[in-house]
Amino acid sequence: MPVLIESIGNLERRLTFSVPEDRLESHVDERLREIARTARINGFRAGKVPAKVIGQRFGEKVRAEVLDSLLRETLDSAIRAHSLRLAGAARIDHANEGGLNFVATFEVVPDFGEIDVSKLGVVRRTAKVTDVDIDQMIENLRLQRRTWRVAEHGAQVGYLVALETWSQAGDERLPIEGVEAGSTILGSGVMFEQIERGLEGLSKGDENVLDVTFPDDWRVMQLAGKAVQVHVKVIEVSEPVLLEVNEEFIKSFGVKSGKLEDFRADIRANLERELKGALVSHLRREVGEQLIAAYAHVEMPPRLVEKEARLMLAKQIEQIRLSGRDPTGIPDDAHIGFMDAACKRVLVGLLVGEIAGRNRLRLDPMRVTETLHLIASTYEEPEEVFQMYRNDPKLMEGVQSLVMEEQVIEWIADRAQKTEQVLSFQEAIQQ
């Protein structure tokens, strides 16, 4: 039968086609003959099994495998012949039960018309890792491994304060009876800023009453938006003891030489990797937002958007589960809340693919290798991780997709109207 294409929606198509029976039977016979040459069945010598026995033993499975292969080959040929560009996988059903006529339903990529990226305005950030950033990271590492000793003087920023508190908000006392025990490192922001400031200079046994006004969105509902008297009593004040940056300290971070220059070089490499990731992520968001603004009027394939929304919901459910919470109360239609974000993500993805195709952008294998080395360098056995990625098609597909997207994003940014924004390392990674 001839291939029949029908439009059943703005972006949905139905394609009716058939697999030639003579071609199917020819391929099945050929495959069964291949099996017969090596098949081992009890009672027969290898390669001497009768064709009838081979057909009885393997015929049904082989026919299903060959039909699936020919079905997809025939469908792909029809799609190419009619210049159809699919947005997602096709759903294939039998047109007649048990026959060789099939119906494929799928969505197509929308027509974006002319794509002129030179009209887009992109803010491109730049930043560098400096010696000051490396010094700060070393200080952070020292802080991570600090110990504490009882202080003989009042609390300062960076000191650990153990305390008891109770609050009076109008006629309401919190807690109703007794006190709440807790601790905070001054300047860490664990407690409300006004409370931490009120603890500065206090020593063990000191008490104070602090007049605090909590913001409307404060996490404790009874205190939110209220002027409160917070009664504090200091139980203990401890000062930090920082380790010396010596050979032992440096080796504890995997720097075998124990030398400071090697330690700083490792830190610089890590910070530069973090910075690159932050700059690339920002550029991806920046270009994505500009593409969304310019092409928001283009209709997106509804089934593809719904699929993306369900994937986003599934990811959130997994995050809830990993955090130890129970996601079973989430309703079945919760994906609807992700539809807007999913539509934008699909729009950017299709546009990136369209731009790559129209401009014949090709995946840079050298960049893929560099990305693999970058990923592997974050592990203790980088060469093993590198080879693991190289030998796993799914992992490689993910890396290649990421690299291709980065290439297209940079291609767009290079041709858009650019505004350069120079930031410090800290500004770049925090925004």
From Swiss-Prot:
Catalysed reactions listed for this entry: [protein]-peptidylproline (omega=180) = [protein]-peptidylproline (omega=0)
InterPro entries in the record: PPIase_dom_sf, Trig_fac, Trigger_fac_C, Trigger_fac_C_sf, Trigger_fac_ribosome-bd_bac, Trigger_fac_ribosome-bd_sf, Trigger_fact/SurA_dom_sf
Subcellular location: Cytoplasm
Enzyme class: isomerase
Keyword terms, alphabetized: Cell cycle, Cell division, Chaperone, Cytoplasm, Isomerase, Rotamase
Assigned GO CC terms: cytoplasm
Statement: the UniProt record of this protein carries the keyword Cell division: yes
GO annotation terms (biological process): 'de novo' cotranslational protein folding; cell division; chaperone-mediated protein folding; protein transport; protein unfolding
GO molecular function list: peptidyl-prolyl cis-trans isomerase activity; protein folding chaperone; ribosome binding
PPIase FKBP-type domain: residues covered: 158-243
Documented EC number(s): 5.2.1.8
Family per record: Belongs to the FKBP-type PPIase family. Tig subfamily.
Record's comment describing the protein's domains: Consists of 3 domains; the N-terminus binds the ribosome, the middle domain has PPIase activity, while the C-terminus has intrinsic chaperone activity on its own.
Cited function: Involved in protein export. Acts as a chaperone by maintaining the newly synthesized protein in an open conformation. Functions as a peptidyl-prolyl cis-trans isomerase.
Record-given protein name: Trigger factor
Species the sequence originates in: Xylella fastidiosa (strain M12)
